């Protein structure tokens, strides 16, 4: 629906969509008044002059997260219950498997790319698990932090007995979903 120069998408009851929403394979966003977001970037997702998101890894990740989280949670769950549902989903060997993938840490947005790749392929290493859990946590309202460090291990073959590893911190708590595999 267009009112003057402002575009809206409305449901069958005439209510404008607010927040991120999907129509077909496209991602849109309505502001608090339901006005379609255009020529703007919100939460790393860039919207064009027609009001739908560019088809880049940020929009694809957002869509994947919306799909998965809507399947594994419900609106009656608390934020912490949703986080636990995300944890259970990600650490279930029936949903994901361990596979080696070394991201380009110098590439801007590598965390989102790694999370997207893991969600669509089903496989990842510690960085994939950490980035995916962080992306899921962010989607439900947390402010996660992906940590890159070194822990005891021999995977890297380093003489000091340490190996590179990635994990997540959320509200001061440490989460290591890859450690479940």
Predicted ranges, named:
Residues 82-86, 90, 122-137:
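Active-site nucleophilic cysteine motif
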Residues 8-9, 28, 87-89, 96-98, ...:
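Aromatic side chains
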Residues 104-108, 119, 123, 154-159:
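A glycine-rich, coil/turn loop motif that links secondary-structure elements
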Residues 58-118:
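Secondary-structure boundary elements
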Residues 128-181:
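Hydrophobic/aromatic-rich core segments of domains that either
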Residues 10, 30, 73-76, 120:
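Conserved aromatic
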Residues 2, 37, 97, 119-120:
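Generic, ordered loop/turn and secondary-structure boundary motif
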